[in-house]
A protein has these predicted regions:
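Histone-fold recognition with a strong bias for associated Lys/Arg-rich disordered tails
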Residues: 1-201
Length: 201
């Protein structure tokens, strides 16, 4: 269903929701999506781009978490994406099409974040020298060396990619509901999911 997204791009979007829940926020904002990009397993085109711009990833993560703080607790069930974040994913699609790519990778999500200049994530990145022009140039340099999040897929239509993004929202919701169901199941058996220990132990 999500063949247009690279594995790392899908992982970043799912991790964004996990970051929002971990920090006790009621919706997934651009800062959470940035944290999701930073949390992807191993290197990604996005983290290579930021490193190439001299942005220390651990410092950036700490700054993002400090800026958005902790909420009073995320509601149970699916966490919605903030409208600004939906726009970021739409901009990611446009960046992919503009580059002539038949996939959406973490580099395109990063471009979408910085292109939405009024977002919290974009302001944090711009303060560290990672504005739209700088990121575009570094992404181009990374792609020239074959370092993008490439995926083998037939060239899609714009409508097909938009449909994939909408399907991704649905899948995120399904995964969130499943996590919530399993969490409730563990608690009914006296196990706190965060600690993985029984109350009776």
């Amino acid at each position: 269903m999500f063949e247009r997204f690279t594995d790392k791009a899908r992982q970043a979007v799912v991790l964004a929701q996990e970051e929002a829940r971990r920090l006790g926020h009621p919706e997934v904002r651009t800062e959470h999506l940035l944290l999701g990009l930073l949390a992807v397993d191993g290197e990604s085109a996005a983290t290579r781009t930021l490193t190439g711009l001299g942005v220390p990833l651990d410092d950036l993560r700490a700054e993002v978490e400090e800026r958005i703080g902790r909420g009073e607790g995320a509601p149970s069930g699916h966490l919605p994406f903030a409208p600004q974040n939906k726009k970021v994913l739409e901009l990611s699609l446009r960046e992919a099409l503009q580059l002539g790519h038949n996939y959406i990778g973490t580099e395109h999500i990063l471009l979408g974040l910085v292109r939405e200049a009024e977002s919290g994530a974009a302001r944090l990145l711009a303060a560290r020298g990672a504005d739209l022009n700088a990121v575009r140039q570094e992404v181009a340099r990374q792609l020239a060396t074959g370092a993008g999040d490439r995926a083998a897929a037939a060239k899609p239509s714009k409508e097909g990619l938009i449909a994939d993004i909408e399907a991704l929202y649905d899948e995120i919701g399904r995964l969130s509901r499943e996590v919530h169901r399993l969490t409730d199941l563990l608690r009914r058996h006296g196990i706190e999911p965060d600690q993985g220990t029984s109350r009776s132990a």
